[in-house]
Amino acid sequence: LYIMDKIKMTTPLVEMDGDEMTRILWQYIKDELIYPFIDLKSEYYDLGLVHRNETDDKVTFDSAYATQKYGVAVKCATITPNAARVKEYNLKEMWKSPNGTIRAILDGTVFRAPIVVKGIEPCVKNWKKPITIARHAYGDVYKSVEIDVPGPGTAELVFTGDDGQVIKETIHKFDGPGVLQGQHNVDKSIESFARSCFKYALDTKQTLWFATKDTISKKYD
């Protein structure tokens, strides 16, 4: 009987556990597909909503900094609480999206790529090459601020420079209640996103396309 030596790891894997069924599935994956073949070295972080609440979300930041250190991580799906979840889990506050927190720290790019292997047929049978979707992972809606507008009034966008320069634009004149959302991004992160996309396209030999709504959003997009 031949017993295969387990694959040795030199760099620890940052292991981010999640919520609900993902906890069960991740444990099953480790038991059935990883432990028998790999001498797993990992740094474990419990990103389940209960533990995030117990640590005042510090565990999310710790897991992101560990990922910065080691350069590799696996994250399970997590709950981003809404008002109903705050009540259900008796949370201290409505904690922010763990994905948003981690992406902001890593200044990363999200690449969503299909699994292309024999035995898994695509819906379009003659579709042989993958399509990968890249998304800028910093800022935008994940770092947005929101206001419930109570009644009539004027909403303004104001930038005050460190040199005292003030730039002001009127967003909307409300004649009744409404909502406001402010988003931002920074050139450094935008340039990093572009470099990541070009590098990924070159590494995987895929054609790179860029989509934007600059006909409407002439400065932001």
Positions of the model-derived regions?
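N-terminal glycine-rich phosphate/adenylate-binding segment common to multiple enzyme folds
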Residues: 50-162, 166, 179
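General structural feature for long, well-ordered alpha-helical segments within catalytic domains
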Residues: 21, 25, 29, 33, ...
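An acidic- and aromatic-residue-enriched active-site/binding cleft used to recognize and process polar
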Residues: 47, 79, 213
